[in-house]
Amino acid sequence: MRKMKKRYPDLHFDFHAHNDYDLAVSNVLAAVLSGVKGLHTTINGLGERAGNAPLASVQAILKDHFHAITRIDESRLNDVSRVVESYSGVTIPANKPIVGESVFTQVAGVHADGDNKNKLYFNDLLPERFGRVREYALGKKFRESQHPQKSGEYGTGTG
């Protein structure tokens, strides 16, 4: 793409990535770095064969790593993804970045404990940003001291 941009500097180039090798988002980012301005993305990565670059993932990376300003309302991405899931009949994998059911669930343990210690394991992917909430689940490393609210909720409390 960089050679094309250099050869035709006044042209507006778009980029359309397929996810056949699970690299659609990476390829979109490479296109951005080469100067492409138009990006083709889809909700939930739906598209031919293995799909296309998912809008939610591309948006998050553009904002967090490129400090790009877009007109995407991130707080609506989850709702839009659920509508598309419903109409398309294609289930969103639970671990799909940004919109998957379990991506903002911390299993009580080391990471959950870090949440209680001034966001020790902080990153920019806060669930509230995407219209979601952080959830906690009990795991084999659960300790009451980490999440006393869960102790009472699950009847494991000592009080």
Give the label of every model feature segment.
Residues 1-15, 60-65:
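Alpha-helix-loop-beta-strand connector modules within alpha/beta enzyme cores
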Residues 35, 58, 151:
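Conserved, mostly hydrophobic/aromatic
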Residues 67-159:
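A mid-to-C-terminal "edge-of-domain" accessory segment
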Residues 16-22, 44:
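Active-site beta-loop-alpha junctions enriched in small/polar residues
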Residues 47-77, 81:
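C-terminal helical cap(s) of enzyme catalytic domains, especially alpha/beta-barrels
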Residues 36-51:
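Glycine-rich phosphate-binding active-site loops on the catalytic face of alpha/beta enzymes
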Residues 21-34:
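Catalytic cores of alpha/beta
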Residues 10-16, 38, 135-137:
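Structural preference for beta-strand elements that scaffold enzyme active sites
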